[in-house]
């Protein structure tokens, strides 16, 4: 199962990021001390006309923002001309190992399509030895930089991996590339772009953990979803010593999600029959598709399906084109409660041509004491 994650730190994302603007002041009221927190929320937005073409040169006055139905004041704004940050995560495992050069060329094409001033970080999956065992891990090959020569040289260093730590890779990106939890600054246009089939094979973390961390980061997520199922299933059948197989973690996840009450749970791949292998494959691919759609929608990103890596470069061009037309605005929420509740975001347009449409993140979870 292969996976290329392009982390595209894109300010204009259609995502909403809850950020702590400054350390909350303490206000003393007689015998009670009340903590007030001022939070900056980032909202990446894509705006198109009725024909689907991007609407450029919009101003803060063209946007109305509501949180849980209450109007908010736009305090920060990034236009489509301001630079963004991109982290490129490449996973060359499983069915894509033989296409390493194709992956490298597609990634190089994506980098070349970015504008001057846009910064990129390259993160890759690789095979490492831990406690005497060969495992797949993620590795930050370059920090954020606009040095195109350095980035292209780094692409030549990308190697193959014996697994897909998909969730671990996303968490690593949030922490090591984006700097972990939101800080007190308006971060602008950021995004994650992932070229992957989305099927995790070796992560220690799970989807819910990733979803929560991405939501807190406010980074939009884009997927170039490569269909590897047919190839993978062909390699699954027959001799259990085949080059492709389910990891123990995948098999356990399959039973936990789809058959939680089953008493017969086989974790040894070699003890699975062909019918069971195909059922696991079908279920995990469907789950991966659902998770990608969820992450993209919640963050204001998008999924771009492709049937093979040969189509990846054109899909990257589409992603880059959309990222280049994103806006990002920020507001200080009038709801200062630290209750961990989910806050719904609604953005409306005014003073734009009839039929204009927008896509933005639909909400965020507030901090909790």
Where on the chain are the PLM-derived regions?
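Scaffold/interface architecture of coatomer-like assemblies
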Residues: 17-369
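Bacterial N-terminal signal peptides
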Residues: 2-14
